[in-house]
C-alpha cells in the first residue's frame, strides 16, 4: 500500500493526511475548500482538483466528511465514489455516521464488488496529529489486514470491532462518553465558581484526584481560559449527539444524558460558539448559573 486518497481535508482530514505523509505515503487530497488542500501541499500533499482526481490510482481512499448527508452524496450519488473507484481500491469511510448508513454503504459496495471498511477514528484532530487516537474498524478482516499499514501510520491503536456497522456503533459510544464527560467537567467548574473557587484552582485539584482524565487535560484549560480553539468543533459534536438520539429512537430506547447534552450544545451553538471547541458549552452553563450575562 503506497498511495492514499483523502476526500475531506478539514481538521481531522489534515491530521490524517499529515500522519500518512510523515510515514512516507503518497497522499492525494481533495476538499471543497481549496485553501485546505493548498495548506498541506507544502508538506507534500498532491492537490486533487476533484473527488475523482483524489481517487485515481490509489490503493485506498479515506472519506473524512462532516455530515451523513455529505457522506451519502459522495458515496452513493451520481458519479460518486462507488461508481468511480477502481475495484482494487480499498474504500474506507472515516466520518461519524449512523450504523445504519455504514451498513447501507457496505451493502452498496459489496453489490459492486468493492472492498469497503467502516473506519471511524476516536480522538481529536490534535491527538491524531500526534499519533494518538483509535481507529475502530468494521468489515472483512482480510481487507482490514491489507489496510493495516495505513491505519498504523495514522493512529496509536486500531481495533477490529466486527462486521460493517459495528465500528460506527463504537464511535458513537465513544463520542457519547467523551462529550458528556466534557459537559460534566464544565458543570463542575461552574459549581466551583458559584461557590467562590477559582476554576483554575479547582481544575488543579481535580487533576490530582481519581476523576482525572484526558478530557480534563484537554478541555479543562480551554474552559478556564475561555479560549476555545477547536480540537473538535462544537457543531460537530451537536451533530453527533443528534445521531445518537436518532439511533436511540430507532431502537426504541431513551438516552437521557445525551438529550440534555444535545440541548446544551444547541443553546451554545445558537449563542455563536458553534465553530469553537466543545469546551465552549461552559459559557451556557455559566449563563444559567448567573455567573456571566
Describe each region flagged by the PLM.
Residues 51-114:
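Rossmann-fold NAD(P) dinucleotide-binding segment
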Residues 4, 9, 96-179:
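Rossmann-fold dinucleotide-binding core
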Residues 270-293:
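NAD(P)-dependent dehydrogenase/reductase Rossmann-like domain
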Residues 27, 47, 116-117, 158, ...:
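Hydrophobic beta-strand scaffold residues
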Residues 131, 135-138, 159, 163-195, ...:
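Active-site-proximal catalytic alpha-helix in oxidoreductases
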Residues 1-64, 89, 94, 125:
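NAD(P)+-binding Rossmann beta1-loop-alpha1 motif at the extreme N-terminus of oxidoreductases
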Residues 164, 168, 212-277:
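Interdomain hinge/lid region at the active-site interface
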Amino acid at each position: 500500500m503506497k498511495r492514499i486518497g483523502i476526500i475531506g481535508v478539514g481538521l481531522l482530514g489534515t491530521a490524517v493526511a499529515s500522519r500518512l505523509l510523515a510515514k512516507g505515503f503518497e497522499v492525494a487530497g481533495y476538499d471543497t475548500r481549496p485553501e485546505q488542500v493548498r495548506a498541506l501541499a507544502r508538506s507534500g500533499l498532491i492537490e486533487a482538483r476533484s473527488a475523482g482526481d483524489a481517487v485515481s490510482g490509489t490503493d485506498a481512499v479515506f472519506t473524512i466528511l462532516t455530515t451523513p448527508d455529505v457522506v451519502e452524496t459522495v458515496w452513493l450519488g451520481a458519479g460518486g465514489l462507488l461508481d468511480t473507484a477502481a475495484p482494487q481500491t480499498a474504500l474506507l469511510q472515516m466520518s461519524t455516521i449512523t450504523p445504519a448508513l455504514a451498513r447501507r454503504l457496505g451493502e452498496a459496495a459489496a453489490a459492486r464488488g468493492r472492498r469497503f471498511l467502516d473506519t471511524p477514528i476516536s480522538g481529536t484532530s490534535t491527538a491524531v496529529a500526534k499519533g494518538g487516537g483509535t481507529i475502530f474498524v468494521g468489515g472483512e478482516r482480510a481487507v482490514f489486514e491489507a489496510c493495516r499499514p495505513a491505519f498504523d501510520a495514522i493512529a496509536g491503536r486500531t481495533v477490529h470491532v466486527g462486521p460493517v456497522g459495528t465500528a460506527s456503533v463504537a464511535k458513537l459510544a465513544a463520542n457519547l462518553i467523551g462529550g458528556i464527560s466534557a459537559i460534566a467537567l464544565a458543570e463542575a467548574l461552574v459549581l466551583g465558581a458559584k461557590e467562590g473557587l477559582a476554576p483554575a484552582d479547582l481544575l488543579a485539584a481535580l487533576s490530582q484526584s481519581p476523576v482525572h482524565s484526558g478530557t480534563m487535560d484537554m478541555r479543562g484549560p480551554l474552559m478556564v481560559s475561555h479560549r476555545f480553539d477547536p480540537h473538535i468543533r462544537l457543531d460537530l459534536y451537536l451533530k453527533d449527539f443528534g445521531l445518537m438520539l436518532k439511533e436511540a429512537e430507532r431502537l426504541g430506547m431513551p438516552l437521557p444524558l445525551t438529550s440534555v447534552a444535545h440541548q446544551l450544545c444547541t443553546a451554545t451553538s445558537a449563542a455563536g460558539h458553534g465553530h469553537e471547541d466543545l469546551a465552549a458549552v461552559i459559557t451556557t452553563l455559566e449563563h444559567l448559573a448567573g455567573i456571566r450575562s
